[in-house]
């Protein structure tokens, strides 16, 4: 599936080194991801437009505190202005949230991940929401839920959902080896069938449906926390319509990988048409690229993080040289030069002495040769507060991506992208008639001269949250472009 849009732009000369955007911290939302050990993970941010004004609104996980909905009242090109309003989303025990138009009625719904029952919230319009588990036949369980992904399988009117869970919270004294069952929910009529187990389950902290081989058939990537599993690894699930999910095996090319898997971000960085995957961990971040793209295509990946300057394994600033702890990763073009950059939210789990306590966020700007340059401090987003989830979105509709970061046991932070030496941009909101109006699972392509940049439209990944709204593409200078 491709979403089609064509346009031509022009700009000035290209630069060998990426332009540094200037982020201005603005009064942050009155929201804190609060709590004890059950909230050491999670803390997601969901960005979506729930009142059809084109401006992205926010829901921030609150942990033991109620989740906080923030309506976007910003003026175009002006300071960022969010107001907390009652929405029906103010549940406690929320670890994360993902936007999705579940029933394809044109009004955004949300999945609220919780320590306890996961709740699907139906959008009523005007940024009001109501519980829909019973109406949609959705069994939200009672687990410590930390990961979510959604897609539309071929021919389906309703989405397929995946829930990833963490450890058995009744085993606080000895949680190792207590990973609970992940679940797959397929549609049945105007709702969902009983969930299918995705076992073995290894304490998932991020999930992503992705068409890794461009076959038109999504698979499910699962990133798992090695701290608590026994005999586990990263996972990739076959998801053939009507068939029981099954894991890719070593015989099919899948190599065993064990990391403290926290988050997933995907983007075609090499221009070969296939997505690369950035996996966050504790000092062991990976940037995976297909080892070979000739037939038969196998899910065998090389780690290109070191070669690309994207290991982000220790703090780039300050005197704390202990390893970093990475959470939410997100690819986006923050300086509008036509190249995907990478933001990584950082923060110690909970006073772990072997890892950095002063652990600033990363902002890796991509160079024209495909390597990355650290720029968080210069750009103004190298906060030392303990971060978890985040979202990059154009909150004031000026063509520049702004940033919100959810912090653990500290207030969330908000930055406005004030530009600097930035290029032109293209704003795109994919829409299609019928089921799946946001074209989840589709691909956007931006042609710039002989180069084609590709972006898969996904719901999932990151760490405990994601955005689903219009997207902004930077426009590389000096060439004709088309987006389709």
Regions found by a protein language model. Name each.
Residues 94-96, 115-153, 168-175, 179-181, ...:
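Asp-box/WD-like beta-propeller blade repeats and closely related beta-sheet repeat scaffolds
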Residues 17-35, 156-161, 165, 243-245, ...:
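Gly/Ser/Thr/Pro-enriched helix-cap/hinge segments flanking short amphipathic alpha-helices
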Residues 180-188, 234-240, 360-366:
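Beta-propeller blade signature
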Residues 163-180, 223-231, 344-358:
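Short, conserved, GDST-rich strand-edge loop motifs in beta-rich repeat architectures
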Residues 55-62, 107-114, 159-166, 207, ...:
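Hydrophobic beta-strand segments that make up the repeating blades of beta-propeller
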């Amino acid at each position: 599936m491709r979403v089609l849009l064509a346009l031509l732009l022009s700009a000035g000369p290209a630069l060998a080194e990426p332009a540094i955007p200037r982020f201005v911290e603005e009064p942050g939302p009155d929201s804190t991801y609060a709590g004890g050990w059950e909230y050491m993970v999670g803390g997601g941010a969901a960005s979506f437009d729930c009142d059809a004004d084109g401006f992205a609104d926010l829901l921030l996980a609150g942990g033991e505190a109620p989740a906080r909905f923030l309506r976007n009242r910003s003026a175009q090109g002006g300071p960022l202005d969010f107001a907390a309003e009652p929405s029906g989303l103010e549940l406690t025990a929320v670890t994360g949230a993902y936007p999705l138009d579940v029933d394809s009625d044109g009004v955004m719904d949300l999945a609220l991940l919780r320590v306890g029952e996961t709740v699907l919230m139906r959008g009523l319009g005007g940024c009001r929401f109501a519980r829909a588990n019973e109406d949609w036949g959705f069994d939200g369980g009672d687990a410590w839920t930390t990961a979510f992904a959604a897609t539309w399988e071929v021919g389906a009117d309703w989405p397929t959902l995946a829930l990833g869970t963490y450890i058995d919270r009744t085993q606080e004294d000895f949680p190792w080896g207590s990973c609970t069952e992940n679940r797959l929910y397929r549609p049945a009529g105007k709702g969902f069938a009983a969930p299918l187990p995705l076992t073995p389950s290894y304490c998932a902290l991020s999930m992503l449906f992705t068409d890794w081989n461009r076959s038109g058939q999504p698979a499910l990537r699962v990133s798992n926390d090695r701290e608590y599993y026994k005999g586990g690894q990263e996972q990739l699930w076959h998801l053939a319509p009507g068939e029981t999910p099954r894991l890719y095996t070593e015989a099919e090319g899948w190599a065993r990988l064990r990391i403290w898997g926290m988050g997933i971000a995907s983007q075609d960085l090499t221009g070969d048409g296939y997505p690369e995957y950035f996996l966050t961990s504790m000092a062991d971040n990976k940037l995976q690229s297909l080892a070979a793209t000739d037939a038969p295509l196998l899910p065998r990946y090389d780690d290109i993080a070191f070669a690309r300057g994207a290991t982000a394994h220790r703090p780039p600033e300050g005197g704390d040289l202990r390893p970093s702890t990475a959470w939410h990763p997100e690819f986006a073009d923050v300086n509008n030069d036509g190249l995907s950059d990478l933001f990584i939210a950082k923060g110690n789990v909970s006073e772990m002495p072997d890892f950095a306590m002063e652990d600033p966020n990363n902002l890796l700007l991509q160079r024209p040769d495909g390597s990355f340059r650290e720029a968080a401090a210069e750009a103004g987003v190298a906060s030392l507060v303990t971060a978890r989830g985040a979202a990059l979105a154009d909150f004031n509709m000026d063509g520049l991506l702004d940033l919100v970061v959810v912090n653990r046991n500290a207030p969330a932070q908000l930055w406005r992208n004030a530009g600097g030496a930035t290029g032109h941009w293209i704003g795109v909101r994919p829409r299609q008639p019928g089921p799946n109006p946001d074209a989840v699972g589709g691909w956007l392509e931006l042609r710039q001269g002989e180069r084609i940049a590709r972006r898969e439209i996904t719901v999932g990944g990151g760490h405990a949250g994601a955005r689903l709204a219009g997207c902004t593409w930077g426009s590389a200078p000096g060439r004709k472009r088309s987006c389709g």
